[in-house]
Amino acid sequence: AIEKLTLTKRYYTEALKFIDVLHEATPVICQLLGSKNKSEVIEAMDYFEIGDAYNIEQNKIGIRKMLRLIWTKGSSDEGKGVQTHLIECYKRLFFEAPDSFSPNDAANYIARNMISLTFGATPAELTSLEQLLHLMMKQGMIPDLVIAKLWQVYGVQRREISKKQRRGAIIVLGMLATASPEIVVGEMETMLRIGLGAHGRADLQLAKYTCIALRRINPTSRQTEKGSTTTFSRLSNDHAVLVKLAAITEVPTDNKEWYGVAEQAINAIYALSKHPDVLCSEIIRRKTRAVFARSTQQEPSRPSSRDEMQIEPSQAPTLDGADSTVPASQASPIKRQNSKESVIGLSQLLFIVGHVAIKQIVHLELCELDFKRRKQEKDKEKAKDRHSLGASTSSRRGGGQNKSKQQQQQEQEDNELDMIGGTTEDDFTEAMAHIRERELLFGPQSLLAQFGPMVSEICANNTVYKDRNLQQAATLCLAKLMCVSSEYCEANLPLLITIMERSPDPTVRSNAVIALGDMAVCFNHLIDENTDFLYRRLADPQPMVKRTCLMTLTFLILAGQVKVKGQLGEMAKCLEDEDKRIADLARMFFTELSTKDNAVYNHFVDMFSLLSADERIDEEAFRRIVRFLLGFVEKDKHAKQLAEKLAARLARCETERQWNDVAFALGLLQHKNEEINKLVAEGFKMVQAPA
């Protein structure tokens, strides 16, 4: 009996050790998901799939991390192979019910699994899940019965259902609709009743995801790819969908989730409405009245602090130029408010104003594209008509002279039409640019123009307007308005840079960094001289700000939007950051940069100088960074040239640490230069100037 007990104990001890080994292996196998070797990636996926069958808890982490492989680039068989294998794995894990299930039970099982994939998912994971479901829907892997079950979960009213499940259902349905908009078109009433009705008002996240699903009714370029016949007619502003979308932005609440709802509701309005600017003008006017009517009731007699902020009585025009009546007292800048409601209301108003401004410039761009598309179609039709006319004319009897005259006349007409067409298109583009640059924020009939000075004042006087949420909303609004007009951008750029440098709120600093990145794309000539301020945020004490800055700079540099001067060393420091995500991002950046015209080689000396001069970097960290960077210098010619440049520094080194740094880098380079080897072998010489 004792022997049996001992063996049992040993068995369980070994089993526990085995479980620990499997759990410890999970992070390592997660890393293999990012391997360049296709077979390693596929085997890692298989490991997580098999482990899930044995209910190994840690494998759920790997299964979720697998999702990002849906973005594996590949026109090659290798890239497609990884993507296809991922879809097959997920199909077996979540989309295949046991054989014993009836069709109804199987549909319930799959719908439940799909909903569970949204639980606790990060925004990045949801984006990857959307792409996965998009591809699966395109390949016909999602049965109609499963979609019907998802609508049942979302629309159920008689029995209690958890918020998570209802949200999960509409998230998944919105994702499937990227491949097939008909999924949501047929259930608009359900969405208005649930997501934009009482349930949505009680659960703002449900309302947000309902707005996203509604937006899918109008297919984007991705959804209309490969000759899809899906067409969408935009809705008039009195349509029930648009009325409900406008109403959901006006729900009285102090819940921070309201901002997500308002953003997606405005996105949906701009996707679905024939005249979104008119409807959004109404939303802004009503919100302005609500906010400033409350302010004037509390402080009826206090004058406004700045004359230039006042609006002419009874004239606060709309985005589209139609006048509206808003008393001047309501639109004057707010004074110090003790009322929490006023501050919340103003924060929400500024958020709406900023987001509408951004959506309006996107809307103008779409109008321009639509105009050009229709004009091209019209020109093609005219060309066809002329061609058929020419063919019928040439078939008639007539002398060669007459025919040539007709051809000359036709060619002349074609040239004239081309000239007129070109001018018309250019005129339209010029008009759009003028509206964006001069009308939206400076036009006498523009509603947004009333808010530009107010936002600047709130941001500039953060000691007066102390509320954290108000400052966050105002900075975001300022940044979005700056993306509309280069004139407004130039006037407020010093203010935004000051906010980015000095704001005590990391969220505000992060938003300012993203905004500067956007402006570098919109108005490159203004931002190019100020990129140093952006690089400084890489040394921000908050990891969130540092990470945001690194991602922003990665995009700008790789897309060629900013010129790299001598600041890449700041990004190289991030390779040794305490935050693993920042270090991984930096590695990814340099790996991508190395594919662009010897960029690492060209900037290595500048990076080396900056790193070597920074006494805060210890020797081991410095060596790891240099070893990583020199791994991208592969050509012998480049190695020799770098070695010569670095060797010239040996004689100028003032400290032994500096000399060691140079010697270490030279040791990594395959230069095959005996003179350099001799210099290094002699070691560091302390040269003292005579007294």
Identify what each model region corresponds to.
Residues A1-A691:
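Extended alpha-solenoid helical-repeat scaffolds
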